[in-house]
Swiss-Prot record:
Protein family per UniProt: Belongs to the MOB1/phocein family.
UniProt key word Zinc: yes
Annotated source species: Mus musculus (Mouse)
Gene of this entry: Mob3a
Function: May regulate the activity of kinases.
Lineage: Eukaryota, Metazoa, Chordata, Craniata, Vertebrata
Binding site for Zn(2+): 83, 88, 165, 170
Name under which the protein is recorded: MOB kinase activator 3A
Length: 217
């Protein structure tokens, strides 16, 4: 295992959240396999994100949200030792963008936090969302709530902020590990998906607009 990024990923001393998995034999498991097969076959990412004919949009979106959470959580985990209260006292994306945390429990008003604190709260919050059967039902035949896409938009908008922080403040670490290609591919996959289905407000995409125009067009 010569790739330093992979060494970080499989370092047993690192603690990553367990993956949300799909039960074999379910429709979502089959969709997940199909999506992974498209990526492994080197299919154009723009085509890979498109809804397969005859499939349900909510199922397709649910599969990808869980996958993006797992991947982005992993990417942040590999650079987290360099993202500290001292190095990143404010969760930001350069001097122009500051992200404040708000939830329905402890932080009812937007609150400025350090990047590592923000990330911990974010990953915990998303994990709760995707394991909530009322939002991401796993039983065959259980319908998605009418608010599903609204909930997904909030999750994906917040996940995008992880990319913003990592690219702007920790890209040197990504480069040092030789993992630019991996992270860039993950970003392009994410970008094509959220724009294909209009799942993020274009204003949220502004911090990486220049990089995206070079990478994805």
């Amino acid at each position: 295992m010569s790739n330093p990024f992979l060494k970080q990923v499989f370092n047993k001393d690192k603690t990553f959240r367990p993956k949300r998995k799909f039960e074999p034999g379910t429709q979502r498991f089959e969709l997940h396999k199909r999506a992974q097969a498209s990526l492994n076959a080197g299919l154009d990412l723009r085509l890979a994100v498109q809804l397969p004919p005859g499939e349900d949009l909510n199922d397709w979106v649910a599969v990808h949200v869980v996958d993006f959470f797992n991947r982005i959580n992993l990417i942040y985990g590999t650079i987290s030792d360099g993202c500290t209260e001292q190095s990143c006292p404010v969760m930001s994306g350069g001097p122009k963008y500051e992200y404040r945390w708000q939830d329905e429990q402890r932080f009812r008003k937007p609150t400025a936090l350090s990047a590592p604190r923000y990330m911990d709260l974010l990953m915990d919050w998303i994990e709760v969302q995707i394991n909530n059967e009322d939002i991401f039902p796993t039983n065959v035949g259980t319908p998605f709530p009418k608010t599903f896409l609204q909930a997904v938009r909030k999750i994906l908008s917040r996940l995008f902020r992880v990319f913003v922080h990592v690219y702007i403040h920790h890209f040197d670490r990504i480069a040092q590990m030789g993992s630019e290609a991996h992270v860039n591919t993950c970003y392009k996959h994410f970008y094509y998906f959220v724009t294909e289905f209009n799942l993020i407000d274009p204003k949220e995409l502004e911090p990486l607009k220049e990089m995206t125009s070079r990478m994805c067009h």
